[in-house]
Amino acid sequence: MSNTQKQLALAKAAKKSVNTADTEEKNRALLAMADSLEAAAADILAANRQDLEAAAGNIPESMTDRLLLDGKRICAMADGIRAVAALPDPVGEILETSTLPNGLEIVKKRVAMGVIGIIYESRPNVTSDAAALALKSGSAVVLRSGKDAFQSARAIVAALKAGLAQTRIDPDALQLIEDTGREGSYEMMRAKDYLDLLIPRGGAGLIRAVVENAVVPVIETGTGIVHIYIDKDADWDKALRIVYNAKTSRPSVCNSMEVLLVHEDIAADFLPKLERLLVRDRIEAGLPPVRFRLDPQAARHIGGEAAGADDFDTEFLDYILAVKTVASVEEAVWHIETHSTHHSDGIVTENRHAADYFTTHIDSAAVYVNASTRFTDGGEFGLGCEMGISTQKLHARGPMGLKELTSYKYIVQGTGQVRE
């Protein structure tokens, strides 16, 4: 038995301590984890410095932000765990009840998933978010961090397990796979005897590898080729504010805009204003400017590189924005449906008909009208921290909170009935 299999077996053996814990016990464990995380801040920051030093020069600046921890972010992680503790416990919720003509009483009840596996890349905060959500939803959790963030993840998990050790929940219910090589990931993908669910969080390559190779049931958290369409009837002040936020607030995250579509009737006047905001104003403020990849029509109005064949199918995760002009809301919808990963897409318009057409025909997990796509987030949706953004339709779609991490079973109460 490999070390990875041993860790999977430990999690499976410990799951009953979580599955059978009541709400008070789980909340007490989460609060202890949050306190322990803050108490271990110095150790976590030291580990994070190791990750940052190893990554220096090997990843883009925008990706470094995903990896970076500081005191404020550790406090935010701890507060995120406390926020999960404050959420209603979904386990045990009665979803439906019915009584059959023969007198059988049927109750559909929400239950824990069992053991959840998470494979993720260079975001240390996912470690605490995933642990908190899995444990509150009644499941043990097996984490597999990417190499870039492994030292940070190890220090975070050590702190969380120290918190669990003060409670009735077995610390073995939280595991961090030590094997950061490819084989560690593939063992999790094949671990049908140990894992009830596997969730990948990361880039397109990771997600594709898990979806194509896993025998464990998977919820796909897709990449975010996120579009915003500026309609000819848009309020320009709203449009400029929304585009600025959606592209520049955190370009390295999956709900950041990657493609801008602009109605051709306003492109000549709107795009130069946008260029001033995203390029010259940011340079003057000492901020990284946005670099444009332009279709031929957009290139007539602002400066940038000519868009290549793949630029409208790329999740840049950087200060890069692909820009295209379109002749109508119908063309915008066609382009989005052709290139979208069905994560988050939005329209800016004051035209109700255009907005209704867009929301009806765009088949994404989150569809926005006159708002930034950066709101596609479990915390912003009132779900607490999230396990990821599901872009599939079965079981879960959009930000995955506690309810999306549970299953259900039927309890059938009889008085001696037999089937004729």
Swiss-Prot record:
GO cellular component: cytoplasm
Enzyme class: oxidoreductase
Encoding gene, per UniProt annotation: proA
A matching Pfam family: Aldedh
Keywords, comma-separated and alphabetical: Amino-acid biosynthesis, Cytoplasm, NADP, Oxidoreductase, Proline biosynthesis
One GO BP: L-proline biosynthetic process
Organism of provenance: Neisseria meningitidis serogroup C (strain 053442)
CDD domains: ALDH_F18-19_ProA-GPR
Family membership noted in the UniProt record: Belongs to the gamma-glutamyl phosphate reductase family.
Single GO MF annotation: NADP binding
This protein's pathway: Amino-acid biosynthesis; L-proline biosynthesis; L-glutamate 5-semialdehyde from L-glutamate: step 2/2
The keyword Isomerase belongs to this UniProt entry's keyword annotation: no
Protein's name in the database: Gamma-glutamyl phosphate reductase
Chain's role: Catalyzes the NADPH-dependent reduction of L-glutamate 5-phosphate into L-glutamate 5-semialdehyde and phosphate. The product spontaneously undergoes cyclization to form 1-pyrroline-5-carboxylate.
EC number: 1.2.1.41
Reaction catalyzed: L-glutamate 5-semialdehyde + phosphate + NADP(+) = L-glutamyl 5-phosphate + NADPH + H(+)
Superkingdom, taxonomy of origin: Bacteria
Localization annotation: Cytoplasm
